[in-house]
């Protein structure tokens, strides 16, 4: 038993040393002050002033085998609690592996807001669900992104247990597996039309709950064109719940 513990500690020390080589850390942040009027009298609105802020910590480096890595932690809210974190390992020409806890860096989540914006997404700061794309969430998701081949690239995401929450290393979460999800995003930037980008994404959640009749599905398609200072785009999305009697969601953005 003691021998096994020593082996585990040695392996852990080796992995930590590998990740710490040539590491750089950056700190960024932003803040937003708002005035919101709900209409009617002041009694309807209450205090119209609001403040939100975020701080992000990103660490990058190179491992002994030449692969590069990036670790990210985001803090948000008035108490600056941990909001999201992720790990990405770029394996040269073999693509990028990722582990996501709330960022949305793989699969259909990368297409949530494909239309150009001058400030924030179209649904920023308003009620409603936007296009509702989330690939059954982005907590404890395994991802893979391929290199670009002739302008064509693929991003895959696998969510082994949709009911899970973020866990520290060595931990588990979720009260037993009730559903799993696989989703992907394909983007294509043809070299013959500079500035044009086409995108397609699909998601399917295999639901094992008896209360749900069918699987949940998501689909989105987008087209964007950039020429100098001009940026135009159009995106259509469809989200369908397998729950009996549940309404679907169809959204157009431009």
Task: Describe the predicted segments one by one.
Residues 1-254:
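Outer-membrane beta-barrel proteins
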């Amino acid at each position: 038993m003691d021998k096994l513990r020593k082996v585990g500690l040695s392996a852990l020390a080796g992995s930590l040393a590998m990740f710490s080589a040539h590491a750089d850390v950056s700190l960024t942040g932003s803040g937003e002050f708002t005035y919101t009027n709900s209409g009617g009298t002041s009694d309807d609105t209450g205090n119209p002033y609001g403040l939100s802020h975020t701080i992000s910590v990103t660490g990058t480096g190179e491992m002994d085998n030449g692969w590069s890595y990036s670790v990210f932690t985001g803090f948000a809210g008035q108490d600056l609690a941990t909001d999201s974190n992720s790990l990405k390992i770029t394996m040269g020409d073999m693509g990028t592996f990722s582990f996501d806890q709330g960022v949305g860096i793989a699969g259909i989540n990368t297409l949530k807001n494909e239309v150009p914006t001058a400030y924030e997404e179209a649904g920023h700061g308003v009620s409603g669900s936007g296009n509702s794309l989330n690939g059954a969430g982005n907590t404890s998701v395994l991802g893979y992104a391929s290199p670009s081949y002739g302008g064509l690239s693929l991003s895959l995401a696998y969510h082994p247990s949709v009911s899970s929450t973020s866990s520290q290393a060595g931990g588990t979460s979720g009260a037993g597996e009730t559903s799993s999800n696989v989703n992907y995003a394909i983007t294509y930037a043809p070299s013959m039309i500079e500035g044009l980008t086409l995108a397609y994404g699909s998601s399917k959640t295999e639901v094992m709950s008896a209360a749900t009749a069918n699987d949940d599905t998501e689909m989105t398609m987008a087209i964007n064109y950039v020429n100098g200072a001009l940026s135009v785009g159009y995106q259509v999305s469809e989200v369908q719940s397998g729950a009996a009697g549940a309404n679907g969601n169809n959204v157009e953005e431009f």
